[in-house]
Amino acid sequence: MTIPEKPQGVIWTDAQWQSIYATGQDVLVAAAAGSGKTAVLVERIIQKILRDGIDVDRLLVVTFTNLSAREMKHRVDQRIQEASIADPANAHLKNQRIKIHQAQISTLHSFCLKLIQQHYDVLNIDPNFRTSSEAENILLLEQTIDEVIEQHYDILDPAFIELTEQLSSDRSDDQFRMIIKQLYFFSVANPNPTNWLDQLVTPYEEEAQQAQLIQLLTDLSKVFITAAYDALNKAYDLFSMMDSVDKHLAVIEDERRLMGRVLEGGFIDIPYLTGHEFGARLPNVTAKIKEANEMMVDALEDAKLQYKKYKSLIDKVKSDYFSREADDLKADMQQLAPRVKYLARIVKDVMSEFNRKKRSKNILDFSDYEHFALQILTNEDGSPSEIAESYRQHFQEILVDEYQDTNRVQEKILSCIKTGDEHNGNLFMVGDVKQSIYKFRQADPSLFIEKYQRFTIDGDGTGRRIDLSQNFRSRKEVLSTTNYIFKHMMDEQVGEVKYDEAAQLYYGAPYDESDHPVNLKVLVEADQEHSDLTGSEQEAHFIVEQVKDILEHQKVYDMKTGSYRSATYKDIVILERSFGQARNLQQAFKNEDIPFHVNSREGYFEQTEVRLVLSFLRAIDNPLQDIYLVGLMRSVIYQFKEDELAQIRILSPNDDYFYQSIVNYINDEAADAILVDKLKMFLSDIQSYQQYSKDHPVYQLIDKFYNDHYVIQYFSGLIGGRGRRANLYGLFNKAIEFENSSFRGLYQFIRFIDELIERGKDFGEENVVGPNDNVVRMMTIHSSKGLEFPFVIYSGLSKDFNKRDLKQPVILNQQFGLGMDYFDVDKEMAFPSLASVAYRAVAEKELVSEEIRLVYVALTRAKEQLYLIGRVKNDKSLLELEQLSISGEHIAVNERLTSPNPFHLIYSILSKHQSASIPDDLKFEKDIAQVEDSSRPNVNISIIYFEDVSTETILDNNEYRSVNQLETMQNGNEDVKAQIKHQLDYQYPYVNDTKKPSKQSVSELKRQYETEESGTSYERVRQYRIGFSTYERPKFLSEQGKRKANEIGTLMHTVMQHLPFKKERISEVELHQYIDGLIDKHIIEADAKKDIRMDEIMTFINSELYSIIAEAEQVYRELPFVVNQALVDQLPQGDEDVSIIQGMIDLIFVKDGVHYFVDYKTDAFNRRRGMTDEEIGTQLKNKYKIQMKYYQNTLQTILNKEVKGYLYFFKFGTLQL
C-alpha cells in the first residue's frame, strides 16, 4: 500500500509521516532519542483504526513495561473518544470505545500469559496456576540446584569431580552453584534451551570451530599489535631527533625488527609472537641526556611515553590473547570437553527438576510464560501450529516498541504470529539500538542490527527501514555536542552501531537562540593535606555546588509561551551508572538543606528501623546468634547499656554464646538484682515471641512486635519519620507477600531475606516522593531511560567500568556459548583455554560497547543544559588523555576497548579540538569551524581544583528556624501575632557588638575577610565553626594510627619552636640528635620521629633565611600577643565596636635594628600545569595576605616601629612580604 501524500501544515516530519503510514512489508523504525517515537506509534494505531477501519482488538501492540502499556492504551482511548465526539454517528468508532478494553496493548509477557490462560489444555497444566514472585522463584531454583548437586555427589562421575575441583573451594560450592544458575538463565533466553546447552561442547570437540576461535583472536590481537607498532615507530622517530640516545635507538631498532617479523606479509605470525620476548627495558634517561636535549624536554617525555605504550599493548596481546602457543590452547580444549558436557548435563537436570517443582506447586515464572507460549505456537518440528495460524489471521498488524531490547525467544514468538516474510509482512518495529542497555537481561541487540543492515530505505525486496533522527527534546548545544562525541566514539567495532549521518541527532525543538553550552567539569582532587574528604565525597560536594549554581543562575524555557521561568529543584537530575555515590550525595545535600531524593533500589536493609526488625526476627528464630541478639538488646526497644552487657560477659567469659551468658548471669548469686529482673523480662519476651511464631505467620509476628513496643510510633517521630514508617510497613507487606508464596515460616522468611541481600536484590527504601515533588533527584542511567529533565548532571564519569565478570573461570556468551578456563587437577593450576580467552575478549568488547550506549542514554536526557562531571587525582593525567591516538574519525579501537571509564573517552574527544599543544595527527580536524553545525561541539571545559571550591557554606541548618512556621502555627490568633511583631520589631541598641566575638584569633579574622571577599555571610560561617570539636587525639590513636595533616603541622611547628640557629648550620646528624632530645624531654611523642619531615627541615637549615636568623642580634620564639583590634585596624577614637585580637607568632628576630617576623607553613599545594615559581609565590602570598597584614600591624602597634616579615613554606621556600 502506498504512503499517502503529506498535506501542507501537518506537524509530522517526513520520516514520521512515513512511519505512521508505511505498510505492506515489515517496517523497522530506528527512532533516535527524543524523536517522538511514542507519539508516532500512537498515531499509527489511530490511523489504522480511523483510516483503515481496523478494529483496535485486531492489533497486537507490544511494549517493554506495564507502565508504557497503560500510558499507550490511555492515549489511544483518548484519541478514539475525541474522534467519536467529533463524529457521533460513526458506528465503527463506537465499537472501538468498547473494544479498547479488550485491546492487546501490553508487554509480551502479558500477551503470553493470556495465551496460556486460553490454551492451557495444550500444555496439560492446571488452569489455576499463579505467577511466582522473583524472590520465591530464586529460592526454589537455589533449592533445586542444591538437590541436583547432591545427587551428582552421590554418582561421583570423574568429570563431575574435576568440575568441583575447578569451580568449588574447600569451604563451599558457592561459585559452582552461581555458574549453574547463570547457565540456566542464559539457556532459557533461547528458543530451545536444551539444544543450546547441548551445543556448548561443540567448540571443545571440533577443530574447525577451534580454528575459527584462533582467527577471532588473531583479528582482535591485530588491532593491538598494529597500535603497538605505531607507538614503537613514534618512539623511534622522537628519539631520532635527539642527541646521546644511541642505546635507546638500538633497543627500539631490535623491537622494530621483531615487530616487523610478526606483521610480515600483512598477517599476524602467532607462533613467532608467542615464541619471542618483546618489550625490552629502555635505558634510563640520565642527567647527561637531559642536558644534551634541554630544548626537547617535552619530546623526550613523549618518546618515553610512546615506548611505554608499545610495551603495554604488546603485553596485553601476550597476556590476554596468546599467553601460550595456539597448539597448546587447542590441546586444552579436548581435555575440557567432558567437563563442559557434564556441566551442561547438570544444568539440564536442574531445568527438569525446577520445572517439576514449579508444576507441583502450580506456579509459573516469566520464563515459563515465554516457553509455554512458544510451545503453544509451534509444532514439534518448529513450524507454526494451528493456534499460531489462527492468531496470524486475527492480528492485522503487530507493533513492537523498544525492539532493541527483545531476546531470541521473544523474536521466535513474534515470528510465529506475524504474517508473510520481511518483504510482505505485517510486523512494525520501533527502537533505537544506540539505547540497547539491557544485555544483563539477555536482550540481544544483534536482532535489531541485523534487520537494520538488511532492510532498505525504499524497502525493495526486503523490509523497509525508516530513520527518525529529528530530536524534539533538547537544545542544539546538547545535540551537536552529543553528535560530536559519538561520531568519534561509536562505530560497528566498539558500540556495535555506526554513528553516521543517519544515526546522528538533528535539532527540531522550538527553543530560542540563547547560548546553553554543555559544561564538562573536571574536578582535580585535593590530597589529604588539603581536605579530609575522600575523592568521592569531594565530588558529591562539588555536585551540590553545581546544583546551587543552576538554581541561582539558570532558567527554564517554556516552548509553548516562549518565556522563561526560574529553575526549581525538580528540574535537576543527577545521573550515575549505579547508586554507589548515593550516600555521599545524600549527606552533601543534607548539609546544604537541599531537598534530595534517591530513586534507589538499594539501601533498604541498611536502614536502622529495618535492621532492628530483622535482628528481632533472627533472634526469635535462633537466639544463639550473638550479633542479632545483642543488637536487639542494645536497641531502643530493650535499651541494655554497654556496661550491663560487659557485666554479663565478664561473669561467663568462656561461654560459646551470649544467650548462655545471660542464663548463667541470671542464676548467679552475685549478679545485680536490677539487671537480673531486666534480663528475665527480655528472655520472657523472646520465649513468648518464639511460641507465637509457631502458630502464626511471619507478618502477624511482625505486627505483634510493632504493637507491643510502639515501633511505628517511635520511628515516625524521628527525622525522616515518613520514610521510616514506610520502610516498616514495607517489610510487613513483604512478609504478607512471602506468606502468599509456596514457602512458609520464620526460618524460610529469613532465608528469603538472606538470599535477597546476598544477590544484591534490595527492596529499595520505600518511595515516599512523587513525580511532582520539588526535589533534586538522583537515579541510575537505566532508570532514567525514556525520561527527560531540563538540567542533567551526569556524574561518576571517572568510575571504572565493572569488569569483574571477565575474571570469572567461566565466561558465558549468547552467541558463542561457554568459555571455561583449563584447570590442571594434578598440579592445581588454572590456565586460560582457547574458548575462555576468545569469549573473554568478545565479552570485554560487548561490555565496553554497552557502557558507551549507556553514555548515549545519559547525554540525551537533557533538555536545557548538560553538565558532565569527571574527577582526576592530578591534572597531569589530562595530558595523556588529550594525546589518545586516533584512527580516521574515531579514537583508535585499542584505546576504546581498554578505556577504564567514560571520562577517559569523553575528555579525550572534547579536549582535542581545544588543545593547542597536541600535534595535528592526534586531532580530528585542524579547525573546528570545518565541522558541520549539527555535530560542532559547544562545550565549556573547566578544570577545577577542589581546594578552590569553598567549603565555608556547609552549615548546621538546625540553628535556624523559620518565623513563617511560627506564624502558620498561630494563624488567626491576633494577640500572638501582635506579640511576635512587637518582639521582632525591637531594635537592640548595641547590635554591632553582637556581630563580633569579644576575642578573635588572627586565623579567624583571616577567614572572616576571605569569606566577606567571596560574598558569603561570615556570621553563618562563624556560628558553624563554633561547633568544631577541640578534643585531643586519643593516645592509642596517636601511637598506632597515622597522623592527620593538621597533627603533622603541629608537630613540625613544635620542632621549629626549639630548633637551634647556628652560624655554621647544624648537620643532619645533629638534627637527628636534636629530635631525639625532644623525645627524651617528652616535648614530642616517642613515635613522632617517623612523621617529622627531616628532608624539609634540612632544606630550611640550608636556606638563606636560616642563615639570616642565625646572624640576628635577638631571636624570640612562639611569641603570644593580645591587642585591641581598634588600634590594629586604626579605627576612629571612641568606636565601641571592637574586639580583642589574640595570636601567636612563630618567630621574631632583630637584625640591624629592624624587627622581622617569620611564619612557618606546612601547607601542600598543587603545582598546576604551566605555573611558574613566581606565579606560585604570588598565589601563596595572596592566600595569607590578610593574616600577615594583621601580624605586621599588630607588631607595629606594640613596638611602635616598622616591621617586616617572611613566610616560609616547607614545600616551596621563602617568601618575603
From Swiss-Prot:
Its cofactor is Mg(2+). Gene3D superfamilies: 3.90.320.10, P-loop containing nucleotide triphosphate hydrolases, PCRA, domain 4. The keyword Hydrolase applies. It comes from the Bacteria. Residues 10-475 form the UvrD-like helicase ATP-binding domain. ATP binds at A31, A32, A33, G34, S35, G36, K37, T38. InterPro entries: AddA, DNA_helicase_UvrD-like_C, DNA_helicase_UvrD/REP, P-loop_NTPase, PDDEXK-like_dom_sf, PDDEXK_AddAB-type, Restrct_endonuc-II-like, UvrD-like_ATP-bd. GO terms for biological process: double-strand break repair via homologous recombination. It holds the Pfam family UvrD-helicase. Belongs to the helicase family. AddA subfamily. Heterodimer of AddA and AddB/RexB. This is ATP-dependent helicase/nuclease subunit A. It comes from Staphylococcus aureus (strain MW2).
